[in-house]
Swiss-Prot record:
Gene Ontology MF terms: hydrolase activity
Family assignment from sequence similarity: Belongs to the dienelactone hydrolase family.
Function: Initially, the PKS portion of pyvA synthesizes C-10 carbon chain from 5 molecules of malonyl-CoA, which is then condensed with the thiolation (T) domain-bound glycine activated by the adenylation (A) domain. The subsequent chain release by Dieckmann condensation (DKC) could be catalyzed by the TE domain present at the C-terminus of pyvA and/or the alpha/beta hydrolase pyvD, installing the tetramic acid moiety.
Keywords (A to Z) from UniProt: Hydrolase
Active site feature: C133, D179, H211
Pathway named in the protein's UniProt entry: Secondary metabolite biosynthesis
UniProt-recorded name of the protein: Hydrolase pyvD
Gene source species: Aspergillus violaceofuscus (strain CBS 115571)
EC number(s) stated in the UniProt entry for this protein: 3.1.1.-
């Protein structure tokens, strides 16, 4: 693997405060959070693939709203069929047991159906993928023509080398220098693979933060806040360059 499977370090972090701007709706039987850009355009869009807390985590909705404020329609589906890791999980929660019910055979159909609705119902012409932690794997899996045009992932998990080797679009990676699930040897492996592909790529590394920083860092810590904000800016800049047309 070019990044390791989710583990107990995925279920920590801080809750953030703020008023969300989007709306909860459904694509068929899939709950989705949708946030529109100021001009309500659906031409340039982002499929937001969350971490293991799914739609229940306000942090993710606030980030989705920020992408929308920068000119993108954002759609965040419930990847877990109503079974995310509880935000208020007990210390004994076993993430690996939970993960067995949320592997590609369960998640791929949700991503495929959401992309279809984005293109057919909403009229999206260009779609980028944002993936945090768990969601990063599926940005990589779907970075192909007719699916996702551009990808941005932060502290990704569970990505197989063959999945990364197969991408056909620009990919930007935001990483922590202290991430046990995406350690230096896995970053270097990923860089070696990407260097052999004919696609634009980027890997930014942030010190002083841990796995999950781009979504669940402690905003009261100056360096954590800076890393989170810079990671978000990295994603926006990447999409502005490679997605918007």
């Amino acid at each position: 693997m070019t990044s390791l499977p989710p583990s107990q370090c995925c279920i920590g972090g801080s809750l953030h405060e703020g008023e969300t701007q989007g709306e909860l709706t459904k694509f068929g039987d899939i709950p989705v959070y949708v946030s529109y850009p100021p001009d309500k355009s659906t031409h340039n869009a982002i499929l937001f693939l969350s971490d293991i807390f799914g739609l229940a985590l306000v942090n993710s909705k606030l980030i989705a709203d920020l992408f929308a404020a920068n000119g993108y329609l954002v759609v965040m589906p419930d990847l877990f069929q109503g079974d995310p890791v509880p935000v208020d999980h007990s210390p004994s929660f076993q993430i690996m047991d939970w993960l067995q019910g949320h592997l590609p055979p369960q998640t791929d159909p949700i991503v495929t159906a959401t992309l279809r609705e984005m293109r057919e119902r909403l009229g999206c012409q260009r779609i980028g993928g944002v993936g945090y932690c768990y969601g990063g794997k599926y940005v990589v899996r779907y970075l192909h023509p007719g699916q996702l045009d551009v990808g941005f992932v932060a502290h990704p998990t569970f990505i197989e080398p063959d999945e990364l080797k197969a991408i056909e679009g620009p990919l930007s990676i935001s990483a922590s220098a202290q991430d046990n699930l995406f350690p230096p040897e896995k970053r270097h492996e990923s860089e070696t693979i990407l260097a052999q592909l004919d696609v634009p790529y980027q890997i930014n590394i942030f010190s002083d933060v841990e796995h999950g920083f781009a979504v669940r860092c402690d905003l009261n810590k100056t360096r954590h806040r800076f890393a989170k904000e810079q990671s978000f800016s990295q994603g926006v800049t990447w999409f502005n360059q490679y997605l918007k047309k």
